[in-house]
Amino acid sequence: MKPEERIVKARMKNSNNWIKGYYIYDSTNKKHFIYLLDNSAIKNELTEIDETTLCYFIGLKDKNKIPIYSNDIVIIDNEPDYEYFIVEWNTDLARFVLNGDTYMVDFDNYNSTDCEVIGNKVGYPEYDFLNKHIWSI
């Protein structure tokens, strides 16, 4: 795997700001960090993250050349039904898949350039994209 394919993104701890870099877990202090990339706001520095927002780059880009991460919400251009898909890791298949509300597909069935990233489910915890409604709290 190339180094650029190991990139993750997450929100900074106690912030809504997203950062990208390399994931590091400090097992002694039980803290999660990202070693920031040069193009980040803060350069070459460890920044603590909210581990619940951690998203892994899957090594592919969408039709707009946007990197695709786990937990991204995508639509597929050539789908007859307008459906949202969530990019998720499937342990049984040992690969990232597109999980929709009616079916699941993998990137063997679709070219990533047929997909468009429209958001990330981490950014919209109150919205159930697969069932297309606001969760009642």
Residue ranges with predicted function:
Residues 1-137:
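Secondary-structure transition motif
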